Structures are given as C-alpha cells and as structure tokens.
Regions:
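C-terminal cap of thioredoxin/glutaredoxin-like
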Residues: 4-5, 10-32, 112-198
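Structural alpha/beta surface segment adjacent to cysteine/selenocysteine redox centers
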Residues: 14-117
C-alpha cells in the first residue's frame, strides 16, 4: 500500500483546518490513516525563498476563507495569537509533537496544540501553552519539557523537514501519497482518492 504522510506546522491555520478533518476523511474512505509528520515551515520558507500568503496585502481574502470553512465545519471562530505569524513563531510545539509521536500521541497532541493556537489564540512560543496541550493528551509536562531540548528530537524534526523539501513540498498543509503531493486543506479529498487508488 502507498504510504501517505500529512505534513504540517502549528503556525498554519490551513493546517489546523486540515488536521480537524483528515482522520475522518480517511476513515470514511476505509483507507489507512496517514502518518502525521510535523515540520518546520519557517525552514521551508527560508530554504525555498517563498513568501507566505500571510505576508501579502490581500491576506484578508484568506482570513475570510479560513473563517468560512471553519463556520461550515462547526469549528469555533478562528483567533490569531498576538504576534502571528512571525513574532511568536517557535519550534517548541513542533518539537513537542515529535516527542508526542514517540509516545503514540502525535494526533491528539497536535489537535490540542492547534486548538490552543487557533481556537484559543494562545502563543505557542510560550512553552507553558505547549505544556497545556501536552497535558491534555496525558503527556507529562516535565518529560515534554526535557524532550524538546534533546538533540534526538531536534534531529528528527530537521530530518522530517529535509524529507519534505526533498519531496518538493512548497506549502502546508501537504498530504503526500507516495511521491504525489496534495497541497492545501482544499485538496484533502483528492489525497484520499489517490490513497484509495481511485
């Protein structure tokens, strides 16, 4: 069976929207769940020289689209933390997600983290907020705090990000079905069909 991977970063509201529904879409299709793989989108942008939509003058169009999708799906009003997307960008939540993955809790941690950011408007550069998300999925805060500082966790995040770059990933969220990339929350259904072999 073709491997499917979901690449994301907690700075992305479109990743939040995708994270809230990707598991359900794959389950409904009877397809094996994708591997959740957090990456450093900041490093992707720096390496590729791409400019994110959140820096553009017409970004209000995206804000409206994000809220429209959230409303359609019964999600809370989308809130952006003060300083988003640059001033409060941090690798702490992504490193914590890598740590959670080792405990089999990457999905529950990631959802808790996304909800902290875009439903609660909380700044994830504040490690206390990362630890609240960790506690919500029964990860011990002290263990997470130690884990995100270890070289092995940092190396795994770096390796995941390099893997995404090697595949040709340009934006997030991206769902990779084998070598085929589906960029965006609005292309999840296509990714599911590809994973289903349809």
């Amino acid at each position: 069976m073709t491997k499917t991977t979901f690449y994301y970063d907690f700075s992305s509201p479109y990743s939040y929207l995708a994270a809230e529904r990707i598991s359900g879409l794959f389950a409904e299709a009877g397809v094996e769940q994708p591997e959740w793989k957090p990456i450093s989108f900041g490093h992707i942008l720096k390496t590729t020289g791409r400019r994110p939509w959140s820096f553009e003058e017409d970004r209000s169009v995206d804000f409206e689209e994000i809220q429209r999708r959230a409303d359609e799906r019964g999600l809370p009003e989308v809130v952006y933390p003060e300083g988003w997307p640059v001033d409060n960008y941090s690798l702490n939540p992504t490193r914590a997600a890598i740590y959670a993955k080792e405990s089999g809790r990457v999905v529950s941690f990631s959802l808790a983290c996304f909800r902290q950011v875009f439903a609660g408007g909380r700044d994830m550069s504040d490690v206390d907020n990362v630890l609240i998300a960790a506690a919500a999925c029964e990860l011990h805060p002290n263990a997470v705090l130690k884990g995100i500082e270890t070289s092995s966790i940092k190396d795994k995040l770096r390796a995941a990000t390099d893997e995404a770059l090697a595949l040709g990933l340009e934006g997030i969220p991206t769902t990779a079905v084998g070598d085929e990339l589906f960029w965006g929350d609005d292309h999840l259904e296509e990714a599911v069909r590809a994973a289903s072999g349809v």
